[in-house]
């Protein structure tokens, strides 16, 4: 059974409270429950991890290489400036899909650039929780690591 890591970065623990006009009122727990149900239906195992700390996310990426078939990464604001996180994604051999709940290109100018995207397998933005499902589906529909 494929095993996917769902890695959420800073402020995603505040889903449901932070900017509900942008991110909605559903919580991180709601997201995890929906993804867990989705994964059961397609026989995929998911592991969830969230941190507001760059080093914790980097450690999780390094450790993931031996444990997972793919990573769905929502780096939050780190996507715009964390070269350390970018280098961690580039340094591992398993594919990473960058996901954002909102569309950063439709928001403030500083959000328009991702330093992660050039080293990720792909990027899905602006589709809310559905973006995570699409990323998981990608891993299920491809055999390449």
UniProtKB/Swiss-Prot annotation:
EC number(s) given by UniProt: 4.2.1.10
Keywords assigned: Amino-acid biosynthesis, Aromatic amino acid biosynthesis, Lyase
Source superkingdom: Bacteria
Enzyme class: lyase
Keyword Cell membrane on entry: no
Metabolic or biological pathway: Metabolic intermediate biosynthesis; chorismate biosynthesis; chorismate from D-erythrose 4-phosphate and phosphoenolpyruvate: step 3/7
Catalysed reactions, semicolon-separated: 3-dehydroquinate = 3-dehydroshikimate + H2O
GO biological process: amino acid biosynthetic process; aromatic amino acid family biosynthetic process; chorismate biosynthetic process; quinate catabolic process
Pfam families in alphabetical order: DHquinase_II
Residues forming the catalytic site: 23 (proton acceptor), 100 (proton donor)
Entry binding sites for substrate: 74, 80, 87, 101-102, 111
Site (Transition state stabilizer): 18
GO molecular function: 3-dehydroquinate dehydratase activity
Matching SUPFAM superfamilies: Type II 3-dehydroquinate dehydratase (SSF52304)
PANTHER family linked: CATABOLIC 3-DEHYDROQUINASE
The family this protein is said to belong to: Belongs to the type-II 3-dehydroquinase family.
Biological function: Catalyzes a trans-dehydration via an enolate intermediate.
Oligomer status and interactors: Homododecamer.
Protein's name according to its UniProt entry: 3-dehydroquinate dehydratase
Organism per entry: Bacillus licheniformis (strain ATCC 14580 / DSM 13 / JCM 2505 / CCUG 7422 / NBRC 12200 / NCIMB 9375 / NCTC 10341 / NRRL NRS-1264 / Gibson 46)
Encoding gene per record: aroQ
């Amino acid at each position: 059974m494929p095993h996917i890591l769902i890695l959420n970065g800073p402020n995603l623990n505040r889903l449901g409270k932070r900017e509900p006009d942008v991110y909605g009122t559903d919580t991180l727990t709601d997201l995890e429950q929906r993804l867990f149900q989705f994964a059961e239906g397609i026989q995929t195992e998911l592991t969830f991890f969230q941190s507001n700390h760059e080093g914790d996310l980097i450690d999780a990426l390094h450790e993931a290489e031996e444990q997972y078939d793919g990573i769905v990464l929502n780096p939050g604001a780190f996507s715009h400036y964390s070269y350390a996180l970018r280098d961690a994604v580039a340094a591992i051999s398993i594919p990473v899909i960058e996901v954002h709940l909102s569309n950063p290109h439709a928001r403030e100018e500083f959000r328009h650039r991702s330093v992660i995207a050039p080293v990720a397998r792909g990027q899905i933005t602006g589709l809310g929780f559905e973006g995570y499902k699409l990323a998981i589906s990608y891993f299920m529909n491809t055999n390449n690591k």
